[in-house]
């Protein structure tokens, strides 16, 4: 009986590990706020446990999540939204003091080691504005529709001068 329980538990852990995966982590600037987009897969029925953190000078600072306890200095500066396969964290009043390696990690439950994570190194002078990223990454269907519409208008000779 113990062998059957062990095998069932192992299969459950493997299924959750395979079904929950961070696919990308991007950073950009919205006004004076840092925006982190953590895209992930979730093909299991298990709830996603997650954590956003910043590593600066080898020290990890938890910003937001369901796993670690966010540090007091970041609590009032963070704003979080979640969609089906994306978690978005905003860090307001972003300055050069907030530069470092940001991590989005998925966990099984509690304080277990992450099953999947992605890092992005953020330097204030190297950050791009979010508008360009969101147009290409999130609104690809509108861009394709625009290109198809222009081709259709050109084919019907609507745009000829």
From Swiss-Prot:
Q: Name one GO molecular function term.
A: GPI anchor binding
Q: Which domain of life is it from?
A: Eukaryota
User: Where does the record say carbohydrate is attached?
Assistant: 42, 79, 119, 139
- Propeptide residue interval(s): 131-161
Q: Name one GO biological process term.
A: negative regulation of protein kinase activity
Attached lipid, kind GPI-anchor amidated cysteine, located at: 130
Compartments it resides in: Cell membrane
Q: Which cellular component terms (GO) are annotated to the entry?
A: dendrite; external side of plasma membrane; growth cone; membrane raft; plasma membrane
In-chain residues carrying the UniProt-annotated modification Phosphoserine = 82
Record's signal peptide: 1-19
Post-translational modification Pyrrolidone carboxylic acid, affected residues: 20
Q: Which UniProt keywords apply?
A: Cell membrane, Disulfide bond, Glycoprotein, GPI-anchor, Immunoglobulin domain, Lipoprotein, Membrane, Phosphoprotein, Pyrrolidone carboxylic acid, Signal
What topology does it adopt in the membrane?
Answer: Lipid-anchor; GPI-anchor
Cystine links in this protein are 28-130, 38-104
**Transferase in keyword set:** no
* Primary location recorded for the protein, binned into one broad class: membrane
Q: Function of this protein?
A: May play a role in cell-cell or cell-ligand interactions during synaptogenesis and other events in the brain.
Q: What is this protein called?
A: Thy-1 membrane glycoprotein
The gene it comes from is: THY1
């Amino acid at each position: 009986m113990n062998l059957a329980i062990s095998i069932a538990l192992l299969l459950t852990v493997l299924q959750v590990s395979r079904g929950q995966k961070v696919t990308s982590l991007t950073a950009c600037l919205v006004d004076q706020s840092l925006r982190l987009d953590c895209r992930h897969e979730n093909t299991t029925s298990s709830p996603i446990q997650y954590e956003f953190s910043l590593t600066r000078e080898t020290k990890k600072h938890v910003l937001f999540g369901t796993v670690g306890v966010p540090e007091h200095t970041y609590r009032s500066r963070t704003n979080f939204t979640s969609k089906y396969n994306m978690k978005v964290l905003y860090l307001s009043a972003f300055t050069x003091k907030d530069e470092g390696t940001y991590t989005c990690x998925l966990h099984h439950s509690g304080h277990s080691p992450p099953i999947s994570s992605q890092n992005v190194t953020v330097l204030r002078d190297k950050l791009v504005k979010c508008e360009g990223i969101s147009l290409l990454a999130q609104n690809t269907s509108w861009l394709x529709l625009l290109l198809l519409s222009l081709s259709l208008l050109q084919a019907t000779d609507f745009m000829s001068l």
